[in-house]
Amino acid sequence: MNVRFAEHDDLTAIEEVTRWACSEAIGEMVPEDVVESEVHRRFRRSVLSEHLLSRRLLVGVSANNDIELVVLVDDRTDHIELVTSVVPTRPSRAADGVSLVDSLRFMGWLGPISSSVPLGDTVHEHFYELAGFAPGEVTVERVEGHDVFRREWWLDPVLSAAG
């Protein structure tokens, strides 16, 4: 998987990927209108465009040029937070979290990284686990009157060889 900055021409495909991935991630826990609300809140066109213009919207693209990963990068006080959508796995392959981490580090994001994943979203959990993230605290978020439980995943900062 090749990770790159998203382009304007990617936006329609990004919206399709995020809708599909969110439905797979929380669709069995909450009604479909809650899924749509979650997609709108996290991935509406204005949010995507804002991240695109500030070069904080990344996509992971397969060898066939299909978008398999959508990443919004947000600065926090002491780390960056990722909002991700991972295409549900195919039997033969899954999106590669290691490529994402390598790309983020290459782009200069060297500090700690976190991401919040719905509990039970095994595609996302596996993605972060293989990339070296450690599971953290569980939180509950109220979305349209429904509880959505999430786990924070954390990746330590890059340590300097100079000490």
Regions found by a protein language model. Name each.
Residues 105, 128-139:
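Conserved acetyl-CoA-binding loop of GNAT-fold acetyltransferases
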Residues 14, 18:
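Hydrophobic pocket/interface hotspot
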Residues 114-126, 142-145:
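Conserved beta-strand-loop-alpha-helix junction that forms the acyl-donor binding cleft
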Residues 130, 140-163:
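Terminal substrate-recognition subdomain of acyl/acetyltransferases
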Residues 5-8, 19-92, 98-107, 141, ...:
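Acetyl-CoA-dependent GNAT
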Residues 78, 110-113, 134:
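Short acidic/polar active-site loop segments enriched in Thr and Asp
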Residues 1-12, 153-163:
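Conserved N-terminal entry element of GNAT/NAT acetyltransferase domains
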